[in-house]
């Protein structure tokens, strides 16, 4: 298992991830006030990690965070997540223990076209249990995005 804590531009924010190849998943954990730059930096750090694989499942824990994102920020992040080097073919499981974070994650799932393979839970325990039971199932309706389509969308955002 690999644990990485990186420096992020937002003061009062603590973010880290770990990649567990044996369990075929990565875990992202956030604390404090988190904005678009924090999330994009995490995505970029994981994508450049030699342990990263698009075949991993993801558990993203937003239970101890205040998300500071506009609707435009959510759209920008969704387009970054659709870019080939950041895409995953596995399940995306989020922990969102309040309605604001839940709504933001739903918007993100819609704009990144991940609604079919994304699940949101109130607690970390519920999320981990669900992921363990569904780890061997292929997420439904997974659609490969052509790299030219993703590149064009990314150019328009960045």
Model-identified regions with their sequence ranges:
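Amphipathic, Lys/Arg-enriched alpha-helical "gate/interface" segment within cytosolic domains
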Residues: 2-158
């Amino acid at each position: 298992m690999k644990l990485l804590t990186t420096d992020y531009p937002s003061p009062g924010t603590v973010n880290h991830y770990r990649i567990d190849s044996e369990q075929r998943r990565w875990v992202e954990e956030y604390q404090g006030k988190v904005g678009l730059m924090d999330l994009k930096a995490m995505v970029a750090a994981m994508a450049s990690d030699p342990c990263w694989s698009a075949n991993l499942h993801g558990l993203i824990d937003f239970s101890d965070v205040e998300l500071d994102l506009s609707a435009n920020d959510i759209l920008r992040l969704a387009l970054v997540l659709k870019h080939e080097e950041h895409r995953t073919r596995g399940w995306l499981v989020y922990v969102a223990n309040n309605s604001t974070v839940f709504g933001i994650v739903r918007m993100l799932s819609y704009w990144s076209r991940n609604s079919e393979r994304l699940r949101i839970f109130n607690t970390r325990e519920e999320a981990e249990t669900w992921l363990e039971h569904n780890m061997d199932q292929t997420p439904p309706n997974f659609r490969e995005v052509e790299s030219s389509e993703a590149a064009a969308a990314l150019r328009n955002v960045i």
